[in-house]
Amino acid sequence: MGSKSPDGHRQGPNAESPSSSVAATTNPPKPAAASGLVQGMLDGDDEDEDGDDDGDNQRIGADLKSGVLPNNDGKKRKRKSNKKKKKKTSKGQQTTPPRVSLPSIFHDQRYPEGEIVEYAARNDNLQRTTAEELRHQAAIHNMDDEFLTDYRQAAEVHRQVRQYVQSIAKPGILMSELAEEIETGVRALTGHQGIETGDALKAGLAFPTGLCLNNVAAHWTPNPGAKEVILKHDDVLKIDFGVHVNGRIVDSAFTVASNPVYDNLLTAVKAATNTGLKEAGIDARIDHISGEIQEVMESYEVEINGKAIPVKALRSLTGHNILRYKIHGEKQVPFVKSKTTQRMEEGDVFAIETFGSTGKGYTRDEVGVYGYGLNEHASTAGLHHASAKSLLKTIRENFGTLVFSRRYLEHMGVKNYHLGMRSLISNDIVECYAPLVDVPGSYVAQFEHTVLLRPNCKEIISRGDDY
């Protein structure tokens, strides 16, 4: 989930680019549902033996009626049934679409590791201030076995869900259906449906599912009651969703495009993200990482309609560190060379992501709502509406500081929340997030992974065979 950079982001009517809206298609045909696991069938065979005389024939006839047949040695054996038997699904097997909770598959809670990368030699004698030293010690203390188990479980949920999603994210599918598949899969695999009070805080979705088309760079999700949006052949779709287990958030994103004309755009962004992951590490300077990302990203160009267009790194979004139950920490990793003295530190968790665009390389707020986030330290003194107080209680008990969407509220059965939400927003208790767009006609791609900076290695926890 992309984080806004302090500079370069353009808001409101004075933005450099004209207003645009997310393209929508109404009443499209629904795609066929994905098939489940194929069940094998075992067929039985019948074997009959005849005797030499009438007595034997009569005996065999009686045996046939009783369901017993003789062997060659004269001993009787039971006749095989013609009934077809279903092959049982073995334990530890996932379904298609994925709906079996991971604790039911990984009984010992030994989830797959991410990609383990050893650190290059570094200077362990670097001096840090006392405050930094205390922060390091706290972070390392928290990076225990439970921490790794939670993170690896969340990462495996992400891998299994996105593997299925990649198979159905084809032209003709509705964005609402794609979001439903992602969210249903995450809830099923974590084993937490998020309906009972507090259940969504134990494990589940870490923020609203992002499904951003073309010039929409980030923060767009289908909302209940809105016009349906259908994926088309010439679309560039960014799929960004997060999974958490006990507040340990895995944030990972990828881009799909059916038209091969955009292959170079996707290649550029994937290469830039992998460069950021390669350079990330303990004591790594963030300005150096940003410069390396930009150099790789902007070495590519895309040919569209016979015109070569350079790929530009977005200047208004950044990667970010992740805290427990908070998708955005205080550190940012821009995609362009920047002046900062910040370094990555031991115990940090980072979402290393990059966005590349064929447009201007800047984003602005678009009309619409992506999601909501609680300002945990905001005063509630001016809150008078009963509906707002009730909604605030629901938000605190079920989402805390996790970002959520209208769809998540309605999944819990919350109704008539619009007036209360407006009151919470006007009192600065809840922040509203809008879609972020580049200029109309441009195309933006995104790739993202979560990396843990462990004491002796970095673990790209969300890495899979796909990206």
Curated annotation (Swiss-Prot):
Gene3D superfamilies: Creatinase/methionine aminopeptidase superfamily, Winged helix-like DNA-binding domain superfamily/Winged helix DNA-binding domain. It comes from Arthroderma gypseum (strain ATCC MYA-4604 / CBS 118893) (Microsporum gypseum). A divalent metal cation 2 binds at D251, H320, E353, E448. It catalyses: Release of N-terminal amino acids, preferentially methionine, from peptides and arylamides. InterPro entries: Creatinase/aminopeptidase-like (IPR036005), Met_Aminopeptidase_Type2 (IPR050247), Pept_M24 (IPR000994), Pept_M24_MAP (IPR001714), Pept_M24A_MAP2 (IPR002468), Pept_M24A_MAP2_BS (IPR018349), WH-like_DNA-bd_sf (IPR036388), WH_DNA-bd_sf (IPR036390). This is Methionine aminopeptidase 2-1. A divalent metal cation 1 binds at D240, D251, E448. Its EC number is 3.4.11.18.
